[in-house]
Regions:
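Glycine-rich beta-alpha loop elements in corrinoid/cobalamin-binding modules
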Residues: 1-173
Length: 173
């Protein structure tokens, strides 16, 4: 992790073009015999939930450098979600990992805008489409047309609330 040194703007993490857990385990939760995306197809090269693991390592090594998540894993886990592998509802990957920002969906345009705004430190990042970040309720200014999702705690108490959240996310994509 230290070989390339401190980045000028941020660390970007994407565990690959396929969900890491689907790539690593079968539907019966058995370890797959090979991994098409690692050298020599070795199935033991990546940890479970690599976005979380890699972010936590980078935050320990470079606590002041922003970490931006992207890819299918970040997109699908940006809000409270059901985790098949642990058979429970999990918090947003932003909470679990400690990342600063998340780009969801097709990220080519948002990442270019994110870089532009990181270069010009005066510009706000929170108005870029397809960017997710954590903030305090008191810091959030609601606008007309915003969709309010249920909190993780509310989803744990009522599975219909989690289903409603998921519906909004699916319709957004």
């Amino acid at each position: 992790f230290k070989k390339l040194g401190r980045p000028r703007l941020f660390f970007g993490i994407s565990p690959g073009c396929m969900d890491s857990m689907v790539n690593k385990y079968t539907a019966n939760k058995r370890l797959r015999s090979d991994d098409a995306y690692t050298p020599d197809a070795r199935p033991d090269m990546r940890p479970d939930y690599p976005s979380i693991v890699y972010t936590q390592i980078l935050k320990k090594l470079y606590p002041d450098v922003p970490v931006v998540l992207g890819g299918i894993e970040a997109s699908m886990r940006r809000v409270t979600h059901y985790d098949y592998w642990q058979d429970k509802l999990m918090k947003s990957i932003l909470v679990e990992s400690g990342a600063d920002l998340l780009i969801y969906g097709m990220g080519e345009k948002p990442v270019v805008e994110l870089i532009r705004r990181f270069n010009d430190k005066r510009l706000s990042l929170n108005t870029i489409p397809q960017i997710a970040y954590l903030c305090k309720t008191t810091d959030f200014i609601s606008e007309e047309g915003d969709i309010r999702l249920f909190s993780h705690a509310e989803c744990l108490k009522d599975k219909k609330k989690q289903a409603a959240n998921f519906r909004h996310i699916e319709e957004e994509i």
